[in-house]
Amino acid sequence: MAVTSWLEILRSAEKTALLQDGKRMVHYLFPDGKEMAEEYDEKTSELLVRKWRVKNALGALGQWQLEVGEPMPSGAGSLGSELIKESNANPIFMRKDTKTSFQWRIRNLPYPKDVYSVSVAQKERCVIVRTTNKKYYKKFSIPDLDRHQLPLEDSALSFAHANCTLIISYQKPKEVMAAESELQKELKKVKTAHSSDGDCKTQ
């Protein structure tokens, strides 16, 4: 039922779509005032970007919070500037999914693979990354599993290390893949404007 409820929330949102530079951009406006923006590769339907924006206590819109995708380049908000500034040495954390896995990349981690430990913390509903040399520690959640009210499984987790980058993968549960497939069908029904058409219209 959880999958259906999240899908119903997405279906009930006001959606606008725009096709530009080989990307399908979808904007969702939810009844509670929250906004979500997604970008998909037009050919593969692979999710490239997902970000959220909520109103603050005074009703003003806050900054976009990135959930999936590359950090913004310098000048596109304070978060992006900060990340670019620190990119020479500090680890950079980002999420970039594939069709079958949620995937996170942590750049600027030079230690060999056997130094890392990646595990699920069931009670906290998060993934924890540690190093045996105590040089790096990171805890992060998987919002998709929270939205679908699904458990986190250690067996779905794997990681690799190459070129000073730790790549963590979590195999998508079948419920999530089914929901993503249904969402793609839903998005095909949304009237899509092209970048030359001007503003896209809300469904």
UniProtKB/Swiss-Prot annotation:
- Mind naming one GO cellular-component term on file for this protein? extracellular region
Pfam families the UniProt entry points to: DPCD
One GO biological process this protein is involved in is: ventricular system development
N-terminal signal peptide: none
Give the protein family.
Belongs to the DPCD family.
Q: Describe its function.
A: May play a role in the formation or function of ciliated cells.
What is the protein's given name?
Protein DPCD
Which species is this record about? Rattus norvegicus (Rat)
Primary gene name: Dpcd
